[in-house]
């Protein structure tokens, strides 16, 4: 006959399962920390590496290049919003005569897997922010905690030194001044 003090009794095992579930819930709640604000203005920078995927060129007329950009974000105020997110963008770079622009779309993903989607255009510049003279992102939506998010993100383009190796990879820091609102 077993005593109730043995570690493999049904009562002890059930207690351990309940305790581990309770501890998991407490740790998860603590890890989530403060909730995300519903509205705000956030300065952040994305550290990007650009990879050319395909290019068309007609000498003397112009080029069009498909680019993939990957990187991470850093909130400049040390806040949770738009900090430590992975960034993945698809872009089209066009240069023809006096026209030079890059259009595209980006997805920012946080550690929970929640996403923010935006489009961008380097021809749309917010003249009220002269330091952000490279273009503007338009936040069109999100998933999870970012569901219902909209906003604008004027941005600058700060080129970094050339990357080593082949493939035409380039890098850039892109600071943003983001005004956003989550309407759920």
Give, region by region, the residue ranges found by the protein language model:
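Beta-strand-enriched cores of mature, soluble protein domains
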Residues: 32-184
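Hydrophobic transmembrane signal anchors and adjacent membrane-proximal interface regions, especially
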Residues: 17-18, 180
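Bacterial N-terminal signal peptides that target proteins for export
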Residues: 2-17
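Residues at structural and domain junctions
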Residues: 18-19, 99
């Amino acid at each position: 006959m077993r005593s109730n003090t043995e570690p493999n009794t049904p009562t002890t095992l059930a207690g351990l399962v309940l305790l581990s579930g309770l501890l998991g819930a407490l740790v998860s709640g603590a890890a989530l920390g403060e909730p995300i604000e519903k509205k705000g203005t956030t300065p952040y920078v994305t550290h990007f590496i650009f990879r050319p995927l395909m290019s068309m060129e007609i000498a003397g007329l112009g080029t069009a290049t498909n680019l993939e950009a990957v990187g991470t974000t850093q909130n400049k105020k040390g806040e949770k919003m738009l900090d430590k997110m992975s960034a993945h963008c698809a872009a089209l770079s066009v240069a023809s005569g006096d026209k030079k622009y890059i259009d595209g779309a980006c997805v920012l993903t946080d550690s929970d897997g929640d996403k923010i989607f935006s489009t961008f255009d380097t021809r749309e510049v917010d003249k009220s922010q002269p330091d952000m003279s490279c273009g503007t992102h338009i936040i069109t939506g999100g998933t999870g905690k970012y569901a219902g998010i909209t906003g604008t993100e004027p941005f600058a383009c700060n080129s970094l030194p050339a990357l080593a190796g082949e493939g035409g990879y380039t890098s850039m820091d892109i600071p943003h001044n983001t005004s956003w609102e989550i309407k759920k």
